[in-house]
A protein has these predicted regions:
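C-terminal structural segment of proteins
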Residues: 1-170
């Protein structure tokens, strides 16, 4: 794995300053399960120079209703969403989706933000050392489109005036 700087942000303000300072050279993590594996296997088209960890920031793990909106903090674990009484009563589809996401271990550790921001699940994308330089990595081709793609997204499988890609919805 290439070297990178790791910042443990103590506050939202500190995280925002680091994001502003490093811009596109940085990635925000709260555990980094997804991105660290990609970095280790040299999968990313551009390797981040900085990882900004927000895991220790207080107050980012909440579920609350405000007016007609449900607000969920970035660090709220999937299991907490699945078990929350308010979510189960007023937003049962969300509770069910959270309860069926991944394995129990991942639900206990994984956050809603990490789940939303996780990278593409396409096995062509995940081949180590960028052996398949696909559209998602800046290439010109989607290998899953004509290859083995039975577990890929049905959304975005064709694009107007562009090469098809089946990776729209990880």
């Amino acid at each position: 794995m290439k070297r990178f700087k790791h910042i443990n942000a103590a506050s939202s303000e500190e995280a925002a300053l680091a994001i502003e300072q490093y811009g596109s050279k940085a990635k925000v993590i709260a555990g980094g399960t997804d991105i660290l594996g990609q970095m280790k296997d040299n999968i990313l088209p551009e390797y981040p120079e900085v990882l900004i960890n927000i895991k220790k920031i207080d107050g980012l793990d909440y579920i609350r209703e405000e007016g007609n909106s449900l607000k969920i903090g970035a660090l709220t674990r999937l299991e907490d969403i699945a078990r929350n009484k308010l979510v189960k009563k007023r937003y049962p589809a969300l509770a069910e989706a959270a309860a069926k996401t991944a394995s129990p271990h991942i639900r206990e550790q994984g956050t809603i933000a990490g789940n939303i921001c996780q990278s593409n699940r396409c096995w062509y994308y995940w081949v180590p050392d960028n052996r398949f330089y696909c559209i998602r990595k800046g290439g010109k081709r989607c290998y899953a489109y004509a290859g083995e793609g039975r577990y890929h997204s049905i959304f975005g499988s064709t694009r107007v005036n562009d090469t098809p890609c089946v990776s729209e919805c990880p």
